[in-house]
């Protein structure tokens, strides 16, 4: 912010004693957690600026982060340079005191010309930002990289210090580091070194010495890798690496965390090709590290050492050191230096050349891959779209590298890393696998848990097999997305995908047979609970099995249907019912259970509308078994079936004087007796049957809840009339039809009895013809 503004803000905040140099320290000591987290997240920003921003935004951390990340706010460049000088000194101290201080300030500011440092600082506010990196490359290759590397490391350290902002802010890498760092002690060691770096960032020799000591700790890998990488790479790497370093800024924080440690076998040999490929490899590593962080790998110790390695190698030679570290890690990761190096080398030179050609694009080349990793984390930097700008070739290379890295990262979770390397070798030759892996990458974010389980379960399998398996798990996502890219193993998925779904659709048939035990015994009466409704034949298995037979519209007559109809519960004893022979006790028990049940309100349900005789025409009544109950017994129905069909269609026969009307499905009334619902549902009473006019009191009585049970199941409507007259108590005295009297049990055959909801039957959903 302009000094005037800043001062005004500072004056508002008395706690900042020195506006310039003291500010960082004072902010560190006095700073609110929001400020510290912001400084960690945006090391380029000075704590003064961040503080003033926070004050403006009422200490709303989210708002400030949003503003900064979306470039809605920009730092005040011109005046800061001086302050940075003062701050740099203090920053190193402050940073040591508080690991949380902005990381990049410290390293870069300490030794570098401030204008350069600023130029590097300005754009990168977005940690992902490309601009930050190219500027650094322009300003001072070594120093800016050191600043970034230091910043990244510091951010790592700060992440170790543990504010969530540091975890988020220093890229996904930090969270990974905090998670991955085996003991914080190692991180502490690294921070100490970093602080040393901060103090004398330019004293690369001391740094080299320290890192070498650390390298001794990490003995073979870092020292040899650093040594090998140092001599050759500097000239080449500075150009090619700078873009990779651009990755290095926040990505670099992420990268070392990859599993490099296990691969201490570092391919020190062939350093030149690997180094040439380093930008690509670094990208890979960054991706790996990001992804490894995402799938927080068990190899945490490795990652922590990797972090130390980074810290070591970075200090040695700021530009080269980072590239070296990445090179080391990559060499570690890529023991097949030549084989994989050849493929990445081809890729890397393309990417590096594009990066070198466009210094600004260089970071872009690096970023998209790492950004993909970031996407999986869910953190989005403004630069996510950079990949679009890149030349397609570099994009392909990046994706391949990204694939390789993710393969590394995917497999290594449980696999020994040598396998990873071998697999990488295999992968480099096989672009098709990489494509699969890319697809897997994209789907990976959706399905990582599955994949992780895969790897854990099958740690040792070569990636081809794993790939084949991953596509199988991912196949659903991939088929939608990348079906064209999928290779054969993913196609293997198809049966697997289809298989699990098959079971899902049986749903109701299962219930019909299993969960509603009553159904088997007396399916027809399941609706008996509805007053004046005789559903006796409705749910018969035969009927359900072949709805064509049972459906009113399809059946020629009551007689035709009666063969299928279960005996009406009321009229015929369930013992006679084809479905189940029940002894008297069972019947009685059923009666008792179902009489106790309050009258369900069933009318809104499927069967009322679709199975009622209206659709079959009243003629279908007997056929549905709704009217068939009227006959009293199926035997009678079958005997009388044709007669009844005609009679019910026309007028209830003398034998069934009120029979049809009692059901409410009299042939003469298209739908419902006025009383069918005992007038509980007055809207549904339709033109009264002449006979029901006789019965209305009766039926209404019958359908009083106490009596409804009796009537609902009453085998014959004549009985229903009788019951309405006084037998409605749920016991038919005797069906007038002379059918064997079945105790009037409103049998909710298929009904699960949900007292609140009425009896809900699967048959509601599986109507005989559905």
Curated annotation (Swiss-Prot):
- One MF term from GO for this chain? DNA binding
- State the post-translational modifications: Ubiquitinated.
Cellular component terms per the entry's GO annotation: chromosome, telomeric region; cytoplasm; nucleus
Keywords from the UniProt entry:
Chromosome, Cytoplasm, DNA damage, DNA repair, DNA-binding, Nucleus, Telomere, Ubl conjugation, Ubl conjugation pathway
Using the record's annotation, list all stretches that form the CUE domain.
Answer: 30-73
- According to the UniProt entry, which residue ranges have a biased composition of type Low complexity? 18-32, 158-167, 220-231, 267-306, 335-361, 404-476, 484-530, 586-595, 632-648, 668-684, 691-713, 720-749
Biological process (GO), any one: DNA repair
UniProt xrefs under PROSITE patterns: CUE
Main location class: cytoplasm
Basic and acidic residues biased stretches: 74-92, 185-219, 392-402
- Provide ranges: composition bias, Polar residues: 95-122, 136-148, 175-184, 573-585, 649-661
CDD domains in UniProt? CUE_DEF1_like
Subcellular location(s): the record lists: Cytoplasm; Nucleus; Chromosome, Telomere
Positions of region (Disordered): 1-43, 74-361, 382-530, 567-595, 632-749
- Alphabetical list of InterPro entries matching this protein: CUE, DEF1_CUE
The family assignment reads:
Belongs to the DEF1 family.
Q: What does this protein do?
A: Recruits the ubiquitination machinery to RNA polymerase II for polyubiquitination, removal and degradation, when the transcription-coupled repair (TCR) factor RAD26 fails to efficiently displace stalled RNA polymerase II. Also involved in telomere length regulation. Binds DNA.
Q: Quaternary structure per UniProt?
A: Homodimer; may form higher order oligomers. Interacts with the large RNA polymerase II subunit RPO21; the interaction is direct and serves to bridge RPO21 to the Elongin complex in a manner dependent on transcription stress. Interacts with RAD26.
- The name this protein goes by in its record: RNA polymerase II degradation factor 1
- The scientific name of the source species is Lodderomyces elongisporus (strain ATCC 11503 / CBS 2605 / JCM 1781 / NBRC 1676 / NRRL YB-4239)
